[in-house]
Design a protein with these regions (language model features):
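Short loop/turn and low-complexity linker motifs enriched in small/turn-promoting residues
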Residues: 1-76, 87-161
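A short tyrosine-centered beta-strand micro-motif
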Residues: 80-85
């Protein structure tokens, strides 16, 4: 067997083993997420695409949460008004260049209803521009400088039901 064939065989075997391992890990994560959603169907499920999260002035570690498919935090909260705080980040490609945008710590209140699913994240277009204005329950415009009228991004909360 030639040296090249041996290297190719080793690479294929390693790839196959790693592929199987990651498929199992992904299945385990999906099962955990589905189980979490089922166990908390009587609560509001909030998908948060941010970091350094505090809910009602308590760290995320004190809340009932799991990690979602896109590394978002899925938090189960009771109905009512909740204060959410976090640092939001997003990436955009403008004219072939990648632009990373990161907010300062942003705090806002959301009135949640049990049995609904909510998504909170940073977007570069408003809910109206995305034609999702009917689903948006909160929209916070962000600018590069305080008091500026030049809106760079939005933090939007959508109700998915």
């Amino acid at each position: 067997m030639s040296r090249t064939m041996m290297i190719i065989t080793v690479v294929v075997v390693v790839w196959a083993v790693l592929f199987a391992i990651f498929m199992l890990l992904d299945k385990k994560r999906k099962d955990a997420q589905n189980s979490f959603s089922e166990e908390n169907r009587d609560k509001a499920l909030v998908h948060l695409y941010c970091k350094n999260i505090k809910i009602d002035n308590k760290p995320l570690s004190e809340a009932d949460y799991t990690i979602g498919e896109y590394l978002q935090k899925i938090v189960a909260l009771t109905s009512g008004l909740h204060t959410i705080e976090g640092i939001f980040e997003s990436t955009d490609t403008v004219m072939g260049k990648t632009r990373n945008v990161k907010s300062e710590k942003v705090s806002f209140e959301l009135d949640l209803e049990a049995g609904n699913k909510y998504t909170v994240g940073m977007y570069f277009n408003s809910a109206q521009e995305n034609k999702d204005a009917d689903k948006a329950i909160l929209e916070i415009p962000l600018s590069l400088y305080r008091e500026s009228d030049n809106i760079e991004a939005y933090i939007i909360a959508y109700r998915e039901t």
